């Protein structure tokens, strides 16, 4: 099936990522972060999971997007929000007590998580006529109405994004900047929690991160999409760019993340700044580096096979 710009029962998260409705690339670099930083990030992640359960039960936890933790840490650091700290036993890790940190940013991120997941489920229904996902989405109707009344701007932006990306795929849009910009516009509105003095910088940060996410996803799926003849705007790039796609994409990705980081550095964030910088300057590149290693291994394997023949 065709892939929409940037794509979460059982494989909900995977399907969300394939559609670009969760990020999949915004994570910490474990090797470069202190133990204290890792514990804090995990506590916010556990808090998001607990909040989703509080909002709509176990089904909410099934829609958990790990990447939304970044948004929680960002908003917590910017607004210096106090945490409600609780110890609990996790069903997946029952051997020792876990710690969850929850604040108003957690509640906001959980709401955005549910809206994105809802649209993924509806999209699955439209594409595949999956009655399981239609039924799952139906169970979120009450939550959708609640969140829409609370955050009409953000929900409206996500709805507009879903409509526009459908049109883009249908018409096989070749303008990469235009297509990536759609994800940027949507993420910009999600990052902008409140219309206040920080709104412009948060929007700018979200816009460039959204474009980065879209391009990284298109780059990761390039070979598969070309082979299966699925929509991917990278297949339309000029011949000279296509000859060295890795370098060209790296330059574009670096440019986008540079703009994102500039906006971050203009925000007066001290709390968790180490975690956020770890993600922005290192963690977001983890998948790219993994893909490079994977490509080199495939090339080496092909050379060995050719040499044997």
List the predicted regions and their residue ranges.
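An active-site-proximal "capping" alpha-helix that borders the catalytic cofactor pocket
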Residues: 256, 260
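Single conserved hydrophobic/aromatic residue that forms the stacking wall/gate
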Residues: 1-13
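Short, highly charged C-terminal tails/helix-capping segments
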Residues: 279-280
């Amino acid at each position: 099936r065709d892939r929409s710009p940037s794509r979460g029962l059982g494989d909900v998260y995977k399907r969300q990522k394939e559609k670009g409705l969760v990020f999949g690339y915004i994570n910490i670099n474990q090797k470069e972060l202190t133990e204290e930083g890792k514990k804090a990030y995990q506590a916010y992640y556990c808090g998001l999971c607990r909040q989703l359960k509080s909002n709509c039960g176990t089904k909410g936890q099934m829609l958990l997007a790990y990447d939304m933790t970044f948004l929680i840490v960002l908003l917590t650091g910017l607004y210096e929000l106090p945490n409600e700290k609780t110890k609990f036993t996790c069903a997946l890790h029952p051997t020792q007590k876990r710690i969850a940190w929850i604040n108003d940013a957690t509640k906001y991120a959980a709401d955005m998580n549910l809206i994105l997941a809802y649209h993924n489920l509806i999209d699955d229904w439209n594409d595949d006529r999956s009655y399981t996902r239609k039924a799952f989405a139906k169970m979120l109707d009450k939550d959708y109405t609640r969140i829409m009344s609370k955050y009409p701007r953000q929900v409206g932006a996500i709805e507009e994004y879903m409509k526009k990306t459908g049109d883009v795929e249908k018409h096989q849009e070749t303008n990469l900047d235009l297509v990536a910009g759609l994800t940027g516009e949507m993420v910009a509105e999600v990052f902008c929690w409140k219309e206040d003095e920080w709104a412009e910088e948060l929007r700018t940060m979200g816009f460039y991160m959204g474009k980065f996410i879209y391009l990284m996803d298109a780059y990761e799926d390039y070979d598969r999409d070309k082979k299966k003849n699925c929509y991917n705007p990278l297949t339309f790039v000029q011949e000279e760019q296509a000859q060295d796609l890795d370098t060209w994409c790296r330059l574009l990705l670096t440019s986008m993340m540079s703009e994102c980081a500039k906006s971050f550095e203009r925000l007066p964030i001290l709390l968790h700044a180490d975690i956020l910088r770890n993600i922005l300057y290192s963690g977001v590149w983890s998948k790219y580096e993994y893909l490079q290693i994977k490509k080199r291994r495939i090339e080496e394997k092909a050379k060995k096979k050719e040499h044997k023949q």
